[in-house]
A protein has these predicted regions:
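N-terminal leader/targeting segments and the first structural element of proteins
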Residues: 1-32
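Compact, well-ordered interaction domains used in eukaryotic information-processing assemblies
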Residues: 26-27, 31-36, 41-55, 59
Length: 126
């Protein structure tokens, strides 16, 4: 009899220590369990539309350069995952180092970059 695969849900924190997203590798979900992006093996974070958003740090946080021209190419997205049920309680955020002036926390300063499939500025018109 096959045993079910246990998926590990990793909270992604913002700079204030709040869990604003969850990682079930390679997918990123918002607090409502909706798919908002994905991570490459090199820790680059992409939106559901395939646009580069930033990088996943060891904290874990999603950060990007303040003056990012985003010269990375748009990537094809992996197959859309099912919605998850986020945990009711998450561990406290680890101590995080301050970001340098040239870096920003995406979940705090640019959360619109990680939107769901049915919303967002970059979505194609019908």
């Amino acid at each position: 009899m096959a045993t079910p695969v246990q998926t590990r849900i990793i909270p992604i924190y913002n700079s204030q220590g709040e869990a604003d997203a969850f990682l079930v590798y390679p997918y990123i979900f918002n607090r409502g369990g909706e798919y908002i992006g994905w991570v490459t093996p090199q820790r680059d974070v992409y939106s559901v539309m395939g646009h580069h958003v930033g990088s996943l740090t060891n904290d874990p946080r999603i950060v990007r350069r303040r003056a990012d021209d985003s010269d990375k190419p748009r990537l094809a997205c992996p197959p859309n995952p099912k919605r998850i049920s986020p945990p009711a309680q998450v561990p406290l955020a680890p101590m995080m180092q301050e970001l340098s002036y040239g870096m920003i926390d995406v979940l705090t300063e640019n959360p619109e970059l990680l939107h769901t499939l049915d919303s967002g500025e970059m979505r194609q018109d019908m």
